[in-house]
């Protein structure tokens, strides 16, 4: 139940932020995030492709490939849920699925993903992203760390 709630929370949080960004006129952006000295900004970008607009001329692929990946992540989580342990991997998968669901909602219902976070520091200053992307990245790190820890634990048993 915890992992289902994590999926819902991550997805709904990002969708709520996207809705707030969408409700404001384009002319109200960019906005500085207070306390960051202008380094973190809220912007408004409609991304019809993969990150950085890649493949925007292939909308079917841009919708279907992330759907296939999210489905495989959901299948993996479904296989892990009945098993004890693997909490780090389960949490990572839930974060990835939640972020993916938010972006998939955008792709299928808006026709584009709403990106709104900008950090004016290299190397990330080339990208505008959203909280769903952050959850996907964090989930990837958690799942990867889980695999690394299992590998280290397996070597110690030898």
List PLM regions with ranges.
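Alpha-helical transmembrane bundles and membrane-interface segments of multipass inner-membrane proteins
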Residues: 1-158
């Amino acid at each position: 139940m915890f992992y289902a709630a994590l999926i819902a929370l991550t997805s709904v949080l990002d969708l709520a932020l996207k809705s707030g960004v969408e409700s404001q006129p384009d002319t109200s952006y960019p906005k500085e995030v207070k306390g960051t000295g202008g380094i973190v900004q809220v912007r408004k970008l409609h991304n019809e492709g993969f990150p950085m607009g890649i493949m925007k001329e292939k909308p079917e692929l841009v919708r279907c490939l992330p759907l296939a990946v999210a489905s495989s992540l959901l299948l993996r989580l479904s296989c892990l849920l009945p098993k004890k342990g693997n909490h780090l991997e389960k949490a990572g998968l839930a974060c990835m699925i939640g972020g993916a669901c938010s972006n998939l909602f955008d792709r299928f219902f808006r026709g584009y993903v709403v990106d709104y976070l900008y950090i004016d520091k290299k190397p990330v200053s080339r990208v505008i992203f959203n909280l769903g992307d952050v959850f996907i990245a964090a989930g990837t790190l958690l799942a990867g760390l889980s695999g690394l820890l299992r590998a280290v634990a397996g070597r110690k048993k030898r």
